[in-house]
Amino acid sequence: IKRIICGLIIGLVLGLVVPQASVISILGTMFVGALKGIAPLLVFFLVMSALCHMKSGQKTNLKFIIILYMVGNLVSAFVAVIACRLFPVTLTFTDTASATDITPPSGIAEVLTNLLNNLVKNPVDSIVNANYIGILFWAVIFGIALKHANKGTKDALENISDATATAVQWIINCAPFGIMGLIFSTISEQGLDALLSYGKLILVLVGSMAVVIFIINPVIVFIFTKQNPFPLVFTCLKESFITAFFTRSSAANIPVNMELCKKLGLDEDTYSISIPLGATINMAGAAITISVMALSTAHTLDIHVDFLTSIILCVLAALSAAGASGVAGGSLLLIPMACSLFGVPNDVAMQAVGVGFIIGVIQDSCETGLNSSSDVLYTAIADIRE
């Protein structure tokens, strides 16, 4: 963690002092690229290996973890709604050039349909395009099919899985250099001025996420484990949140989370599935972003949103957030769908997406950090509860 902080500080200083030295940003691009490149293989082989070695009748806690993921999404959306009622935000709409080529989903049905279509896509195509729902589906199919394979086949699969995990560890050891490149790129390209005009919106978004991280999640930990929640919460923040914050991709953080689960001594048969699944459907941060941006757009247009509509928004945000899987800025694409609940025209909703891109350097970083660190937290809760 000390090396990562050093990399962060050096990247910040270099971004302010020599912003033209663009070669430094290559370190960040390579780090994120390496994590994204290895993650699909890690998930595929780890899940296959875990399932083919699983004995009949062996228990996992996946059902409970999935329930935690969904509850986390719903509660986070509710926190965002309360925050927007206490601190209503008026948006300053700008040019949406960065969002003009985006086609947002037409509704929750399209989001869920896309999710189901991704489930059965070609397994090779899924690995190449980091389609984690598809990777999980085929890894489970092959893993179950290989349960009756001979010992040599199972050992070979386990060796490949171990080799992939070792490669991941080597990449993670380069995190200080990667984070230095990422923070340099952010500061040199975005600067700090672009963020100041949206200060209140950023505070509401980040504040809502902080409430979930420091209040809601510890309460959930305590309810199910009857232990002091903060050691586990802060371990997840230190080991998972920080790297997710800078990579801004739940998919890229999967190897980091796998390594943390191993360090915590969690059941590999469970976390090898729950972590990549969490990167797809555990989107508490996305639920907050969707809710806050939709309600802020409604407030800007003087549209009154009653309590019942707010509750419907919570459910809609929680469900649709599960479709914003593993993609930096993915939740922004779902803002127009949430805005349609209030009758906001699509062109205006797309302006809200444009605002999201401007503040994305903070919003998306915090959102991904919350999403990804919660994957480990909820998996650990299920393990400790047993």
Predicted feature descriptions by range:
Residues 239-321, 375, 379, 386:
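Helix-loop-helix junctions within the multi-pass membrane cores of secondary transporters/permeases
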Residues 34, 38, 70-78, 206-211, ...:
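Hydrophobic transmembrane alpha-helical segments of multi-pass transport and channel proteins
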Residues 92, 292-386:
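Transmembrane alpha-helical segments and their short flanking loops
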